[in-house]
């Protein structure tokens, strides 16, 4: 490893932490916890028209199933999501965004994409340096 490799790794981690800090602040400014924002994105991003299961959400967020159940309960109380039984498996609950959840996610996603666009040149430069080192 060269000194430049450590510098590139440190810069990459810095860019990740900077984006995560931005994301947490944006979620809080929208009246959500960062985990609630991530759950909204997971539900929408999993792109199943029937909704996402609690297990899907747990897997996407890298949390335990019972933690995902508690998160879904809190989000349902805030009317960010709706729940219904899976028509194919009555043991499973499917979760979908409500209009309120869709609106919150749309607003947050716009500003996140703007932030990523601003960070893209620095990230691309760092990623290119990693690719160059693997040749």
What is the predicted role of each segment?
Residues 11, 38-42, 103:
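Pre-recognition alpha-helix immediately N-terminal to the DNA-recognition helix
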